[in-house]
Amino acid sequence: MAFTFKQFHIDDLNCGMAVSTDAVVLGAWAPLTNAKQILDIGAGSGILGLMAAQRSQANITCIELDDTAAIACQHNIAQSPWASRIRLVQGSIQQLSQAEEYQGYFDHIICNPPYFEHGPQAQLSQRAMARHTDQLSFNELLAAIEQCLSPNGLASLILPIQSLHNFNHLLSQSRLEWVERVDIKSVEGKRANRVLCLLTAQTHRTVEPKVSELTLRDTSGQYSQAMVHLTQDFYLKL
């Protein structure tokens, strides 16, 4: 289906995953202020790359493995106001991260990674690839971020809360460290079901990671003031 934001349009019909609230929240939240080179891992429709282009003056590289999704991503980029600053690489992040030209190249890396680590895969193969870690495990993702992130760079991710324990274990074995964590509650009064993660390649940090919460909707189903403030530059009706 098609999705129109305030400054760009997304056609995600041929992508494994449709435009999601997760992607919008991540794309609006990631701190991109000083970034000059941004990498969007597993770009899909290109939504994160396009949001990053709207929010920064950076050059953006989107990498997408799936052929059909890459075509949709390229189309969405070409139709946007920032086509000159966004380029698409079709292939795997595992391969790109080994290329010498990308070692320590990116100031910011953004990713809404696959999140089903086990269990039955989705019937539709594209959707399965987008949703399951078989194509990109957390271990591979962290290794790629380590390779591609500049020494003072940041990486922004969104994960299901139930994946956090395993993710933290793998993170402890990497050279990356926490900067900030935001637990996301879909509705006021419910338990958090997602977590925004901000990581850095800086080692031996002396500052404790910042921890906070974000509630998306109040008990009546309306967007919370925090959600409105976060996404008002993107959603048409805010």
UniProtKB/Swiss-Prot annotation:
EC number(s) reported in the record: 2.1.1.223
Gene Ontology CC annotation, any one: cytoplasm
Organism superkingdom: Bacteria
Entry keywords, A to Z: Cytoplasm, Methyltransferase, S-adenosyl-L-methionine, Transferase, tRNA processing
Subcellular location, record wording: Cytoplasm
Gene3D superfamilies the record matches: Vaccinia Virus protein VP39
Protein name: tRNA1(Val) (adenine(37)-N6)-methyltransferase
Species of the source: Shewanella sp. (strain W3-18-1)
